């Protein structure tokens, strides 16, 4: 069966997977943003009217927190590690996706579908080893979902990320599960990659525009299974927009965000190729406690799997303990999870399965002990990453 492109998306980077289909079907400047006309010219729009992510993009905030309809796919990704006063610990994810719909026929109706919006909401109760997740799909028409600079928010039904002068407010409710957080950004946005782009594959435009808010001080309330907890902790936000990214030989990825107790952050990912090799476009970044950023290339680090977990839901086998080494910056840490079962099974909507969950980080930097918490995402271990992604016409 040939799936519509929106059915390919569920995890924060599973959106990368549909970008290949869309085509067949030091810290860079945070200065002036491109206008829509400049995006159109520089982006060299393809036959389906979308721009490509090319070098030279200049980010402008808060404008770039919101929608970029010139690009086929866009996502806003929030995760965090939080604790109640009792020490009871939680992880969470709230992610919003926008996917452009190729419609060659003009339609003035407010019900028309120009974009589809998906959203994912998950809570990891690390104390009780309970994992909850839900998903949504809505059209942009009649304001069922959207990402508006005027309204200063991204939403899908009553799941909302609202921009404020201090940072963000998040709220999501599904049954007797809920999050309601206020977040204050402690650091400026970090642009990932060189010259305004995060290159994901060989070839011009096979990239995204990608930035992160790496340290969001978070407080509020969390409910799971009807039990309510006041919580505090740290969150991470990623925002990417693009049109072309992955290629057929890229079969999955392992991505980690690390927030250390010394005030530093790390983002590292590896793209896996058919045959088991690591793609040379794997990359990452280090953010010092004062906000200075160091971009990491594929040769700068190693990700070594140490322990595996076999899912009782899909039969997939995931590496749930890793060693990460960045010799250039003196880092040697292990990542492990307190709760192996944080797999999302999405056969009823996307047909994709992936692991996304809270992790502990412990090791050394320059020979001194270091520890923290983070989030780990792994795709392509439980069935094809891109089912029917490259069908013949």
Regions found by a protein language model. Give the residues of each.
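Cleavable N-terminal signal peptides
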Residues: 20, 29-31
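Structured soluble/peripheral alpha/beta segments that form catalytic or ligand/cofactor-binding pockets
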Residues: 2-4, 31-393
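Short hydrophobic transmembrane-like helices used for membrane targeting/insertion
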Residues: 8-9, 18
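Bacterial N-terminal signal peptides
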Residues: 14-24
